[in-house]
Amino acid sequence: MGRESRHYRKRSSSRGRSGSLSKSRSPDSKRSKKDDRTASRTHSRRERSRSRERRRSRERKRQRRSSRDRRRSRSRERRRSKSRSRGRSKEKPENGDQTADKKKIKEEKEEEKPEDQDFDQNTLEEEMRKRKERVEKWREEQRKTAMENIGEIKKELEEMKQGKKWSLEDDDEEQDKAAEAEESERMEEEEVGEEVDPLDAYMEEVKEEVKKFNMGTMKGANDKKGGMSVTKVVTVVKTKKMPHATKKKGELMENDQDAMEYSSEEEEVDLQTALTGFQTKQRKVLEPVDHQKIQYEPFRKNFYVEVPELARMSPEEVSEYRLELEGISVKGKGCPKPIKTWVQCGISMKVLNALKKHNYEKPTPIQAQAIPAIMSGRDLIGIAKTGSGKTIAFLLPMFRHILDQRPVGEAEGPLAVIMTPTRELALQITKECKKFSKSLALRVVCVYGGTGISEQIAELKRGAEIIVCTPGRMIDMLGANNGRVTNLRRVTYVVIDEADRMFDMGFEPQVMRIVDNVRPDRQTVMFSATFPRTMEALARRILSKPVEVQVGGRSVVCSDVEQHVIVIEEEKKFLKLLEILGHYQEKGSVIIFVDKQEHADGLLKDLMKASYPCMSLHGGIDQYDRDSIINDFKNGACRLLVATSVAARGLDVKQLILVVNYSCPNHYEDYVHRAGRTGRAGNKGYAYTFITEGQARYSGDILKALELSGSSVPAELEQLWTNFKEQQKAEGKIIKSSSGFSGKGFKFDETEHALANERKKLQKWALGLHDSDDEDTALDIDEQIESMFNSKKRVKDFSAPGSVSAGSAGGVSGSVSAVSGLGSLSTPSAGNIQKLEIAKKLALRIQAQKNLGAEAQDVMQQATNAILRGGTIIAPSVSAKTIAEQQAEKINAKLNYTPVEKLEEERQAAEAAETVKRYEEELEINDFPQTARWKVTSKEALQRIGEYSEAAITIRGTYFPPGKEPKEGERKIYLAIESANELAVQKAKAEITRLIKEELIRLQNSYQPTSKGRYKVL
């Protein structure tokens, strides 16, 4: 063991060497030499065994490394073997036997080394030759397979081209050919590249083989080659087609920002197409739904169980009880009996606790009758006075209705929808609803316009059982994100509050669009304080066998409101308002109603000057400001509010004590809602109404409201109404009642359509699009201006310069200017005497035909004859015939009519003498706007038009404001155009028309702060 170890460990060998030296120095030399020979033989055998092991290890390394690594490894091994042999030779004893053994070992090693090197080199060459043969064979197979595939691809392309002969897109065919040529060139380049660098191709194939081995698809060497060739066929086809397809996609330049910028600069955007697409996209959700194709979940409507106490009541007792509840009247079969306490309506304990917490002691008359009717699953029309608790009447049955159904899941719409006409009323109902929804774990979302839509969309996506909305914003929500925000598929309970306003002509399309998208077997409830008969017919279209509950008559002011009507002049209204505010301002909050937004802002300034802090509320204020103003008014931060009728509906302020109608309401329902803001929930209130003599037509509605509510009617109001009726009767006019809000909405009739077309034409003309192809048959702006001109054309004949026959011609035509021109004439020349005689004979013949004597000659003829005879003009006596002719001329001038006899006389006079025509035209500009009149009547404009057209233009007549007619002998302001050339008159008229048109366009598109909130179409 010790001898073997000294051949492998240096320390052991040194230790052995020192031991051998000590032995050599020993006296027993024979024994020492014998041992040394034995050791040398053992050493040589071990050296040979080690060389064989090294050869085996080198062979294993050759298989694992590349050719370059193998060469380096062999050189390193040779250097190591030499160093080891030298080291071991130094370790041997220095005697003669050891030297001989060393020489033998070296000779053996030198004989073995060439053999070992030759073996390694031959093995490497053999491996390289075999590998090269395999690569060449594989390349040949690949080349054949690729050529076959190219032929098949070409055939397919030819077949595709033949199949697309019908196409007219020659550019696409050229692109296909170019792409095919590029494809073949790319394949050739790849083949050339494979010849240049075969090692890369081989390594790729090795990777493919490894993948196939892992998948277990290759079972042998032959199978491996075949599978490899098949795989490459598929690879060739895919690698050639996929880049081609991606290249075609890349031509769209969708992800290239530079290309996108370029396209946006060069291409024109069709705004009309984009708008149409957007509107169509919005309408997709709101189109009528085919409910027969949708399978809705069943639900329960009837939850009402009549308690024994009510069941024992006889019909007579029920009638008496309804009479006690302010005279409830019920229409419809099967209406339940009215309840007496909250417990009898069948609501949960949580709702009862909420009612107790918010001091709802017992049901009001409308609640007592409406709640059991709705709980029974019936559709309802509820009519009750303002402040009677209509909101609770439809909220409590709604909670019971919702809790009976399964919870709202993800991406599902609400179960109940409450629609209101105003944003303020929507917020108020939401606030009232949240008093109960928190304890019932229900979610309420208020959807209204004027605010950001993103927050409301986020709330709807989280899910809600109840939506309180205005119709316009609800339609926007249904169309947002292709209908993914919310839907109406699970809606089973629909409430329309202030139903008469909702079914106004302006709200009806939006309301019907929403209702038609709800399932047909829904439960629909309507409430309002006023419900005209015309609106009732519209409402019944969406109701199914409704029950009508009416409390206290239709449209009646609450008896708790003390009403006063004051007939007053317009100038004294503000002072009277200050007097009323002095009495009531300290007692509570006050609302002052006006009719227009600008009047609200003006009255606000006047009150601020009078040291009354106040705020104004109208539709022109931003929604956030409106919300804050109402909150401040309800909280008592500001106790005086100036508002339009936007605040007249649904606004509930506890401490409101006074309502002042500064502008008289224009119909009965508006008065009821204004006065109904005070005197709510049994509190005392006061209502003052100012009416002027010019507003006598509204006095009948105020008189009716006072009589129906049981208030005293002032004698001045009765006298005002009586005088108005007598005046209308004397004029032969019929007095019509103006009930309802129908006059405020869009009518969607031909008049509004015509106004919209006119506004569209004005905009097109301003943008230079007046020659577009979509012009309709409506009057354009040029025809409107022409009709307002009320043009009058005349053609007058005058004698040529130097002619003496002007007197006769002027006498025939009746021209005054001819007389003024005759004053400068001298004795007629000899050449004109003959023509003068012909004119005299013609005049005598005409007089003889008409049986007229010398006394019948008109003033112009007498003056002409006197001048021709050389005498003086004597003031003529005015006969009855002359007066009649003057009256006839006035009528003819007003009607722009020329008698036939006069035309015949002018024609004969023109034939008898050489005359010069003068063309005249009158353009009436009295009815145009002031700026338009100024523009065409300025000195610079008239001078420029005269120089351009070579016509004389003068301003005549007097300006008369609208509604005032000129007196006899006067005319409205007009422009008189005179010229000897008809073309000059036409050019002057065209230039005047152009100037007026430009001014009208400017006025149409300019901002006019004085008419804020109202628009006037010229």
Curated annotation (Swiss-Prot):
Q: Which reaction does it catalyse?
A: ATP + H2O = ADP + phosphate + H(+)
Example GO biological process = exocrine pancreas development
UniProt keyword Nucleus present: yes
Span of the secretion signal? none
* Annotated stretches, region: Disordered: 1-200
Low complexity: compositionally biased ranges: 15-24
Q: Might you report a single GO cellular component term?
A: Cajal body
Q: Provide the alphabetized UniProt keywords.
A: ATP-binding, Coiled coil, Helicase, Hydrolase, mRNA processing, mRNA splicing, Nucleotide-binding, Nucleus, RNA-binding, Spliceosome
Q: Which residues bind ATP?
A: 384-391
Biased amino acid composition, Basic and acidic residues: 25-39, 88-112, 126-168
Motif DEAD box covers 497-500
Q: Which domain of life is it from?
A: Eukaryota
Q: Name one Pfam family in it.
A: DEAD
Motif span (Q motif)?
340-368
Does this entry carry the keyword Nucleotide-binding? yes
Main subcellular localisation: nucleus
Q: Which family does it belong to?
A: Belongs to the DEAD box helicase family. DDX46/PRP5 subfamily.
Q: Relate the protein's function as given in its record.
A: Component of the 17S U2 SnRNP complex of the spliceosome, a large ribonucleoprotein complex that removes introns from transcribed pre-mRNAs. The 17S U2 SnRNP complex (1) directly participates in early spliceosome assembly and (2) mediates recognition of the intron branch site during pre-mRNA splicing by promoting the selection of the pre-mRNA branch-site adenosine, the nucleophile for the first step of splicing. Within the 17S U2 SnRNP complex, DDX46 plays essential roles during assembly of pre-spliceosome and proofreading of the branch site.
Q: Extract the PANTHER family matched here.
A: ATP-DEPENDENT RNA HELICASE DBP3
According to UniProt, the name of this protein is: Probable ATP-dependent RNA helicase DDX46
What organism is recorded for this protein? Danio rerio (Zebrafish)
